[in-house]
């Protein structure tokens, strides 16, 4: 067997060394940023805000006659593809909560909208902390961005679902080749949707310029972790259903709690990957870093941005 040329060996060695240094730097960075703690914090905020968010989304969709039935389609799609196993129980609980909000007064509806804005605001603060962003957006700009997410987001989602339904109804799909390709895309749709959702989050939320390649890499990691966690979590709660023996009819609640926590952990891990890729000078081979200097540099960065730590507010 022919040996690899020296130049290829050098490239392979350099790539392996770079991967090890990057992984070490990433783990140190994640430990310093306490991604597990922040994931729990965001999960708590999400659980308080999930019903207001769903209510606002469905209310906006229902105000457009063309999207009259899209809200139900979106709910079914999300539960089927993004909530592992026991989706029916979680779906039923959420629908019951949302239905109860219909009995609220105008003042209560305003507070629901504020709760939804708070969730988006906390996501913004946590992600900007990961990127060590110290310069805050102006209040007017932040509010405009949050308002756009709450209003245009549901409309764009509804338009996407409506367009998919229209394409599905076309005679073009009767062609075997086209139909097979379309079905393949549909099967991969959860992964594709996750990737672009993470990509938009990592590219647009931080108040600094993010390279497309870095955001794409972090999004790919997060999307793959999300798909793996869905399968792993589903296997666990179906093969080891001890939670049902303990919680009985309330089993859907801890399932939702744990799943939301895992989701945010994955979001933050993907964000850390994206941010770390943009700090190549901190972990590249040319710096000949050692583990202790990793900690020192990350700690120094963190201290410079402690004022933006979402938990300190």
UniProtKB/Swiss-Prot annotation:
TM regions (residue ranges): 41-61, 104-124, 139-159, 185-205, 217-237, 249-269
Chain intervals for the UniProt region annotation (Disordered): 281-313
Location in or out of the cell: Cell inner membrane
Biased composition (Polar residues): 281-290
Keywords assigned: Cell inner membrane, Cell membrane, Membrane, Transmembrane, Transmembrane helix
Broad class of the protein's primary localization: membrane
Membrane topology type: Multi-pass membrane protein
Cysteine pairings via disulfide bonds: none
Signal sequence annotation: none
GO cellular component: plasma membrane
A Pfam family the protein falls into: Virul_fac_BrkB
Family: Belongs to the UPF0761 family.
HAMAP family in alphabetical order: UPF0761 (MF_00672)
Protein name per Swiss-Prot or TrEMBL: UPF0761 membrane protein VS_0126
